[in-house]
Amino acid sequence: MVPDEQLLARFFIPTKRERYAEMIGHPKKRRKFLCELAHFRSLDPRYLIPMPPKKLFPDQIAEILTKKGAPRSCWITSENSELDGKEMPLLEALNEVVGRQMGTLLTCIPGRLAYFEGEDMGCRWILERRD
């Protein structure tokens, strides 16, 4: 299973998984899915951890993710077409994403640990499953 599919299976609300699975695998439909990330409401709230208010900079977010087991690199799913579908160092990816108001998911450990940033104010979460 590729990182995008694991995101769907593990962090999206069950009623949306099938629809997004179909979209994410087709180039034209994928673009529509990526545009929805800006104001995304389909993440399963059971696995969302809000970012602490004083931990809003890329290096601080990277530190939190690293303490939770994130490796040095991550997979990017983003409405920013220059980043989408790429793997890059975690801190570099966070520097490109944080504060840019582009819906983006960074997969650190597929199916277990990710980061989401949306366009709306305060829309920054760590996604974590420990099961």
Predicted regions span which residues?
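Structured alpha/beta or helical-core interaction and ligand-binding surfaces enriched in interleaved
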Residues: 1-123, 128-131
